[in-house]
Amino acid sequence: IDTYPGTLQVRNHIVRDIRNYGQIDLGGLLMKSSNVGATRIALQLTNDHLYDVFHRFGFGEVSGCGFPGESPGVLPAARGWGTLEKATLSYGYGLSSTPLQLAQAYAALANGGRLRAPTFVAGTQTPDAAVLDPQIAATVLEMLEKVISEGTGKKAAVPNYRVAGKTGTSRKAVPGGYQSRYISVFAGMVPVSHPRLAAAVVINDPRGK
């Protein structure tokens, strides 16, 4: 994936990386959180294909946990997407999700590509469905492990455990756009060899380094 020179103009908007990463593969895209790389991939997909990826992993609908008042988040209809909407969706803008939805999606990767409805009752079996080929899920899991060992998620490493996950930062949404305040997110699973836990952590207005 060519991310040179670290920026990409989409209509009247400039997509930026923190620096020029040049040629990277999918693993490198995840390790470096390349917005340019994610945009280039998204623009090669149809609206329906990209929407299907989000929807299969549970975004835009309630998780199935049965918790009263659960938010489905926001996933706009694909028919309204232009190139700019596809670009921003590829790196996490233009939609919203709950921490539970994020954890559920990462649990699906850890579960061999099967999305299972979460439950608050230990030992309860809930419905699940195949959303991704098991081999592809395993490959993505390996990439996410490198995010922890070599990329932006090094602080999530746990001694003697193989951790996989992804960091993220987004500006807070306000009516008509975004403000200059941020939300930081980490989602992941452990241990990679035999995943038992998946979690999503959200930090509102992070401070410090």
Describe the function of each predicted region:
Residues I1-R207:
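Beta-lactam-recognizing serine transpeptidase/beta-lactamase-like catalytic domain environment
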